[in-house]
């Protein structure tokens, strides 16, 4: 495994995913022959034309599905959520979201910070996080949040995740997944250092990936009332926008919110903007929304779940999946290229 300037990486071949399509209804309209059967020979001319068209369409759909199946199977799938380990409950919600991740069988599981409440102590990680989300620790790509830093230096977080947390590199790192380049950012202390910004800019300059994604804890944009939009993330957004990043994933607000692609000033930019998902729904109690801010497209609270993304060669599909398996938001979008 070969992380960019750190340690491990995940590599998979991503292909374009074929969107599900329903087969057209085939109208047979077969006329009785007088011998107790319904046969094509007795069709009207218009019915025969409809049948021929339907057969051709069905054959084309079958061929498309046949040749697309390997592409769908090969596209990397990620899950993402933050605000996870809710301490002290015997049947805490993170048990349900962990089972959901296991059922999805992702290529990689991204955590979006505040992995363990209330203070990110190692003992709490072992008692709460490890029996649930720790079941897929081997595919987890974590970032820390402010609650992880309630323990000095986020020691519990770094000790629990070990090399996967990249302590020696300041807790930030990057890796490739199929056609995508992903950057894990450390916003746990509440701000992004100039050294980290420089590293992120240089890392993205070296990337030749078609599609790019960055993830961290504190959202630049949010309609939530507990924290809301974080101005301290503005410089980071500017760097990511300047390097053509496609998607950002955050936690911190304990709800789900999807934004239109946005510029650094928060204006909609369908062609060059960055789409942000806030997914603070991993297990900690929910937070309410205020009035939607510009660019907000979907808001869901009082729910636990994860974001599922399929990383295609030139785009992505997304679905917010509740802990009960119900999909509450989904769509697809192309990469900037």
Describe each model-derived feature in a short phrase.
Residues 78-80, 109-111, 142-143, 214, ...:
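Residue-level marker for buried hydrophobic side chains located in beta-strands
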Residues 17-31:
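N-terminal amphipathic/hydrophobic targeting modules at extreme N-termini
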Residues 3-5, 15, 29, 38:
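Intrinsic-disorder-associated, low-complexity terminal segments enriched in Asp/Asn/His/Tyr and depleted
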Residues 72-125, 195, 202, 222-223:
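N-terminal active-site segment of His-dependent metallophosphoesterases
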Residues 83, 113-114, 145-146, 217, ...:
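Active-site glycine-centered loops adjacent to acidic/histidine catalytic or metal-binding residues
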Residues 54-68:
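Bacterial N-terminal signal peptides
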Residues 38, 44-45:
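Short, positively charged and aromatic/hydrophobic N-terminal segments
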Residues 118-212, 227-247, 255-312:
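Extended active-site neighborhood of metal-dependent phosphoesterases/phosphodiesterases
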């Amino acid at each position: 495994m070969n992380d960019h300037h750190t340690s491990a990486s995940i590599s998979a071949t991503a292909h374009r995913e074929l969107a599900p399509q329903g087969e057209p209804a085939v109208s047979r309209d077969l006329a009785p022959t007088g011998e107790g059967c319904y046969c094509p020979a007795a069709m009207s001319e218009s019915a025969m034309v409809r049948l021929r068209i339907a057969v051709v369409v069905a054959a084309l759909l079958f061929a498309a599905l046949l040749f697309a199946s390997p592409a769908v199977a090969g596209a990397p799938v990620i899950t993402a959520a933050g605000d996870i380990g809710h301490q002290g409950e015997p049947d805490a919600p993170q048990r349900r979201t962990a089972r959901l991740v296991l059922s999805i069988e992702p290529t990689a599981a991204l955590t979006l910070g505040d992995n363990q409440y209330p203070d990110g102590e190692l003992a709490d990680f072992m008692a709460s996080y490890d029996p649930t989300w720790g079941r897929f620790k081997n595919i987890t790509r974590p970032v820390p949040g402010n609650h992880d830093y309630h323990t000095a230096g986020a020691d519990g977080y770094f000790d629990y995740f070990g090399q996967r947390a990249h302590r020696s590199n300041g807790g930030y790192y990057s890796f490739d997944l199929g056609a995508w380049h992903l950057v894990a950012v450390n916003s746990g202390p509440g701000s992004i250092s100039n050294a980290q910004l420089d590293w992120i800019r240089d890392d993205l300059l070296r990337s030749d990936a078609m599609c790019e994604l960055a993830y961290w804890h504190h959202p630049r944009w949010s309609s939530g009332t507990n924290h809301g939009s974080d101005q301290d993330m503005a410089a980071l957004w500017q760097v990511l926008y300047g390097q053509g990043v496609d998607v950002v994933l955050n936690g911190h607000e304990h709800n789900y919110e999807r934004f239109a692609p946005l510029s650094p000033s928060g204006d909609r930019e369908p062609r060059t903007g960055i789409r942000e998902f806030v997914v603070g729904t991993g297990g900690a109690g929910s937070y309410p929304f205020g009035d939607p801010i510009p660019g907000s497209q979907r808001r869901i609270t009082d729910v636990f779940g994860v974001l599922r993304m399929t990383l295609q060669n030139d785009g992505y599909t997304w679905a917010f999946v509740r802990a009960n398996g119900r999909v509450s938001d989904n769509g697809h979008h192309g990469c900037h290229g």
